[in-house]
C-alpha cells in the first residue's frame, strides 16, 4: 500500500510540475522576469497560452508577413518589466495584450461589424469592438493607422486606451486623443 501511495504521489508531482511550466525551458531562464514566470503558475499559464495563440496566428499569416521579429521585440519588452514597480502585473499585462493582438491580427476571432465615426478635421475613424475578449478590446482604423485599445474603467460611457491613443464614447459622441491631437466625433448614421 505504501509503495503504491508513493508511486502515485510521485506521478502527481511530476504531472503538476509539467502543467505549471511555461513554454520555454526554465533551466535556461535569464533575468528576473523569466525566473518569475517559471515560479508563478499564473504567468506560466499565460506563457503557454501565448505560445499556442502565436502558433495558431502564424498558421493564418502569409510567411512574408509573419511577425517573428516583432515577437522577439515583444519578448524584450516583456523582460523590461523588471523595471516596473509591480513586475508581476506588468508581465501579466504584457502577456494579455500580446495574446489579444495576435488573436486579432491572426484572424482567430470573428470580426464584428464596424462602427464609423465622423470627427470633423480629424480623419474618419472605423472602430471594431471585440466584446468577446476580456478586457473588451477595439481596433480603431484611420488614415493608414490601425490601433488596438483596451476598455478601461470610466465614470460613464466606454473608454478605450492604447499606446498614445484614447477613445471615450458616450451616447454616440466620442472624444479622441492621439498623441497631442484631440477631436470630437459622432457616430455616422
What are these regions (language model features)?
Residues 20-189:
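N-terminal alpha-helical modules
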Residues 2-9:
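Sec-dependent signal peptide recognition
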Residues 14-17:
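N-terminal signal peptide c-region/cleavage motif recognized by signal peptidases
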Amino acid at each position: 500500500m505504501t509503495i503504491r501511495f508513493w508511486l502515485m504521489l510521485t506521478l502527481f508531482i511530476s504531472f503538476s510540475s509539467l502543467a505549471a511550466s511555461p513554454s520555454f525551458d526554465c533551466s535556461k531562464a535569464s533575468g528576473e522576469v523569466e525566473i518569475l514566470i517559471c515560479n508563478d503558475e499564473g504567468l506560466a499559464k499565460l506563457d503557454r497560452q501565448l505560445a499556442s495563440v502565436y502558433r495558431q496566428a502564424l498558421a493564418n499569416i502569409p510567411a512574408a508577413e509573419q511577425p517573428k521579429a516583432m515577437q522577439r521585440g515583444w519578448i524584450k519588452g516583456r523582460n523590461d518589466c523588471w523595471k516596473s514597480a509591480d513586475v508581476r502585473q506588468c508581465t501579466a499585462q504584457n502577456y494579455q495584450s500580446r495574446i489579444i493582438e495576435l488573436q486579432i491580427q491572426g484572424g482567430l476571432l470573428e470580426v464584428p461589424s464596424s462602427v464609423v465615426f465622423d470627427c470633423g478635421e480629424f480623419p474618419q475613424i472605423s472602430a471594431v469592438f471585440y466584446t468577446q475578449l476580456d478586457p473588451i478590446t477595439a481596433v480603431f482604423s484611420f488614415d493608414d493607422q490601425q490601433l488596438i485599445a483596451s476598455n478601461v474603467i470610466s465614470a460613464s460611457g466606454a473608454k478605450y486606451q492604447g499606446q498614445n491613443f484614447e477613445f471615450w464614447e458616450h451616447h454616440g459622441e466620442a472624444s479622441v486623443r492621439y498623441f497631442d491631437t484631440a477631436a470630437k466625433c459622432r457616430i455616422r448614421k
